[in-house]
Regions:
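Conserved PLP-enzyme active-site core in the AAT-like
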Residues: 1-171
Length: 171
């Protein structure tokens, strides 16, 4: 299967490419075209690439962010080819929780991944979230055991406290 992911030049994550999980699972990654400003995706180029390679997944979100991502427009491209949209919010999740960065799920992303420690301020770890019950059930079925090897109660308690802080003080 094919996926489209931002290139490293705009902060696309290695796990979405051949050297990371995508490659380990036999996925073919096509680099998303970058806009002329060098900091966002070229929507027309993305649409043309998606029509040509028919990806199962389009990932967006990257570590170099000067502007919000056009999630709704990317979702429209994904819908045209039957792909899902994954927003990598590792660097934005604290700003999303605080209400100063748009919520990718509300804008149309099917999935959002995030670090629990970078801008969120919790313990080391990560989360995958979705508003789609079917996707949530599929993820739950492969998460443990499968994609993860353990469940750390202490880390979960620390994360719960961080999330309570965001609920009470973040927005």
């Amino acid at each position: 299967d094919a996926i489209i992911a931002p290139p490293a030049s705009v902060g696309g994550h290695v796990t979405h490419h051949a050297a990371g999980c995508a490659g380990l699972y036999g996925l073919t990654t096509h680099e998303a075209p970058v806009a002329a400003d060098g900091y966002g995706l070229d929507l027309d180029g993305l649409r043309a690439l998606a029509q040509r390679v028919r990806p199962k997944l389009i990932t967006i979100g990257m570590s170099l962010n000067l502007f919000p991502h056009p999630v709704a427009e990317i979702r429209a491209v994904a819908d045209e080819v039957g792909a899902k949209v994954l927003f990598d919010a590792a660097h934005q999740c604290g700003m999303i929780a605080g209400g100063i960065f748009a919520d990718p799920l509300a804008e149309g992303a099917h999935l959002m991944t995030m670090s629990t420690y970078k801008s969120l301020g919790g313990p080391a770890g990560g989360l995958i979230v979705t508003n789609d019950d079917g996707l949530a059930q599929r993820l739950d079925a492969i998460a443990y055991p499968g994609l993860t090897a353990n469940f750390d109660v202490a880390k979960s308690a620390a994360l719960a406290l961080s999330l309570l802080d965001w609920r009470d003080c973040g927005a």
